[in-house]
């Protein structure tokens, strides 16, 4: 089991990777993990660029918002993360991106056009109903879209990927972006065929 120090560094490393891969831009997006036995969430701070973020900048807080350790404010989306941890007992990491292709401005489900969608994500990528950013409702609205899935899009907002740990959540965010990109390209030249089963 990783220490809190190691998890903080992993959040920084994966956030920087997401920044370089285009899943984050500026200070948008956020990542967290949850240590259930300690009731402790580690989350990226708000308004800090990922290319200058350090492990000590990661904020430790309870799901009720009580900051346990940290000199910066937690991500403005901490309530969304908390709602997902409360509603999904198998989830220990949440990754919220503003990726370029997996957008949700059209409020549509992204069909499972790649095998990865079935194998790793659980099927098509549903779109959660809109809620005001920074509110718990963003996370609550995501729960139905996450049922049986490892990620969803958030209407007019971005992507939410989850996993048992940070590595899984990050990988699922990459798969969501890949499926969305291939679907968008395929849709521009014809009608993509959705996979219903392996």
Q: Where are these predicted regions, by residue range?
A:
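Glycine-rich flexible loops
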Residues: 1-198
């Amino acid at each position: 089991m990783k220490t809190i120090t190691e998890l903080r560094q992993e959040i920084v490393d994966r956030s920087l990777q997401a920044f370089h891969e285009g899943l984050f831009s500026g200070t948008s997006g956020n990542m967290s993990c949850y240590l259930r036995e300690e009731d402790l969430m580690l989350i990226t701070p708000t308004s800090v660029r990922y290319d200058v973020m350090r492990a000590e900048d990661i904020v430790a807080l309870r799901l009720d918002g009580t900051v346990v350790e940290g000199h910066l404010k937690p991500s403005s989306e901490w309530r969304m993360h908390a709602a997902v941890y409360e509603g999904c007992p198998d989830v220990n990491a949440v990754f919220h991106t503003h990726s370029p292709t997996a957008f949700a401005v059209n409020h549509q489900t992204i069909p499972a056009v790649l095998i990865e969608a079935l194998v790793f994500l659980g099927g098509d990528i549903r779109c959660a109903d809109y809620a005001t950013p920074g509110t718990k409702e963003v996370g609550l609205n995501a729960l139905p879209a996450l049922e049986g899935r490892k990620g969803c899009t958030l209407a007019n907002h971005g992507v939410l990927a989850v996993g048992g740990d940070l590595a899984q959540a990050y990988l699922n965010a990459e798969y969501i972006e890949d499926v969305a990109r291939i679907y968008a390209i395929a849709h521009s030249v014809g009608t993509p065929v959705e996979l219903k089963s392996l």
